Amino acid sequence: MNKHIRQQRIRELIQQEGVGNQHDLLRLLRESGIKVAQATLSRDCAELGIVRSKTHAGYRLLLGDESTGRIIKGLVGMEVTSVAANETSVIVRTLPGRAHGVGSWLDQFKSQLILGTIAGDDTVLVIPDSVQNISVLMSYIQKNLSTN
């Protein structure tokens, strides 16, 4: 089962079945003939922007929308303490323990400006596609992390 088909089925189940949590979603996927590990399902949910929210019918998994994206962007931005650059790379400083999440947030945009990221505990090293793009990359990161 390829990722695209699996994620499409996840979207369908969430929209049609009123799924309350990942455990229920995992069960529904297996009943549909899709075998997936819990860790893979968690990654799929993160990539699809799926959130668990309280509704009139109790807690439900919901597909993220534009407003959810803005909320997440704001939360990720609050974890960033500074963005700095030299001639070859950009450094994003975060609150302790939050660099991985910030690095993953940057990775999900799949920007051609970013060759790669490496996250430690409180620092993300962002490698640009070209040293000529450092200032453009800085602006891009600041825009996507809501930093000043």
Swiss-Prot record:
GO terms for molecular function: arginine binding; DNA binding; DNA-binding transcription factor activity. Keywords: Amino-acid biosynthesis, Arginine biosynthesis, Cytoplasm, DNA-binding, Repressor, Transcription, Transcription regulation. The keyword Cell division does not apply. InterPro entries: Arg_repress, Arg_repress_C, Arg_repress_C_sf, Arg_repress_DNA-bd, WH-like_DNA-bd_sf, WH_DNA-bd_sf. Disulfide bonds: none annotated. Pathway: Amino-acid biosynthesis; L-arginine biosynthesis [regulation]. It is found in: Cytoplasm. The keyword Protein biosynthesis does not apply. GO terms for biological process: L-arginine biosynthetic process; protein complex oligomerization; regulation of arginine biosynthetic process. One of its GO terms (cellular component) is cytoplasm. Regulates arginine biosynthesis genes. Belongs to the ArgR family. This is Arginine repressor. It comes from Chlorobium luteolum (strain DSM 273 / BCRC 81028 / 2530). The gene is argR.
